[in-house]
């Protein structure tokens, strides 16, 4: 039996974290506080936006905190007054020791990789970009470094050739909800956690910047396909389209590989009324779905209805 009497403080912000919090609430755990990021301007209109966790907390009348500074004395005192037994962190930010050291049962984090591999901000994306066939989720006790604490539990998930960052995100989210509940039980039973693993030759998952996401068409087919899959739906692999003397940025979301010998230059565009092909070393990348800045996602057929390529059109 899982002890549901523990007072739990939950910390997180995005949809991934909402699903874990939802699991705690629906399974009748005693969530005494929820900490999420402050409201921030977002999007083209810079409208103030609430985090998904905040929306869920408000809808379920949970005790909500949005500190700008995690070391703020007033906030820390409010947290102490909750007398939490355990804190759970999912997709939040680095915590100061004064925060993670508060509860008697500790503070554990759910991370979307099989630690110690893929420490960092973008483990789901990098696992696909690097061509992994397996990843998973890990729960571990937080310490003063990033994703280095004592491992509690892990669960593996296969990465299928058809997976992209979006589908893998949802798989890991589902498995993550299960492992968080199991981790609470394990901590209550005072079961031994795993020993830390040797850190040599590990793969990392650093934050994705725009330059990480630019497609290099002279890479091999596997690298290009994995990059596009690993960045779909967010933040999106991108390239420049050169056409009729203009240079337009375009996000490539879904493609199909066609292996075939050809004599065209890398990046050249081959098109007819129903397809757009980009030339690569091992054949062609067939575009299926893509997006221009400020426009909705579109398919090739819709795009070609009102667009024409010149003979020298290419992707760079």
Task: Map each language-model feature to its residues.
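Amphipathic, non-transmembrane alpha-helical secondary structure
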Residues: 18, 22-26, 76-80, 97, ...
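Short beta->alpha connector loops
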Residues: 13-16, 69-71, 91-94, 258
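N-terminal glycine-/serine-/threonine-rich beta1-alpha1-beta2 phosphate-ribose binding loop
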Residues: 41-83
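A secondary-structure boundary/capping signal
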Residues: 12, 66, 91, 110-111, ...
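Internal anion-binding site segments
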Residues: 199-316
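Donor/substrate-binding cores of folate-linked one-carbon enzymes
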Residues: 6, 26-30, 37, 86-211
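N-terminal Rossmann-like dinucleotide-binding module
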Residues: 1-44
């Amino acid at each position: 039996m899982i002890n549901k009497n523990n007072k739990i403080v939950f910390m997180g912000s995005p949809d991934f974290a909402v699903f874990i919090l939802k699991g705690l609430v629906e399974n009748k755990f005693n969530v005494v506080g929820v900490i999420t990021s402050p409201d921030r301007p977002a999007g083209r209109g810079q409208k103030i936006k609430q985090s998904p966790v905040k929306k869920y907390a408000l809808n379920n009348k949970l005790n909500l905190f949005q500190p700008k500074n995690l070391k703020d004395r007033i906030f820390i005192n409010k947290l102490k007054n909750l007398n939490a037994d355990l804190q759970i962190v999912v997709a939040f930010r680095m915590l100061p020791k004064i925060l993670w050291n508060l509860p008697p049962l500790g503070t554990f984090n759910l991370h979307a990789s099989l630690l110690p591999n893929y420490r960092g901000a973008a483990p789901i994306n990098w696992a696909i970009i690097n061509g992994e066939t397996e990843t998973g989720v890990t729960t571990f006790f937080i310490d003063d470094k990033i994703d280095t604490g004592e491992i509690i539990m892990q669960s593996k998930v296969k990465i299928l050739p058809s997976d992209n960052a979006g589908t893998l995100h949802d798989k890991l989210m589902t498995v993550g909800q299960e492992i968080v509940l199991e981790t609470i039980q394990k901590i209550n039973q005072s079961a031994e956690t795993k020993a830390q693993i040797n850190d040599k030759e590990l793969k990392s998952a650093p934050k994705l910047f725009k330059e990480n996401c630019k497609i290099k068409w002279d890479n091999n087919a596997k690298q290009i396909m994995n990059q596009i899959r690993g960045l779909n739906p967010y933040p999106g692999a991108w390239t420049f389209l050169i056409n009729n003397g203009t240079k337009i940025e375009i996000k490539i979301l879904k493609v199909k590989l066609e292996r075939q010998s050809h004599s065209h230059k890398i990046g050249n565009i081959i098109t007819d009324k129903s397809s757009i092909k980009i030339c690569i070393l091992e054949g062609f990348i067939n575009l299926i779905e893509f997006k221009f800045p400020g426009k909705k996602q579109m398919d090739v057929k819709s795009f070609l209805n009102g667009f024409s390529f010149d003979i020298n059109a290419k992707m760079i």
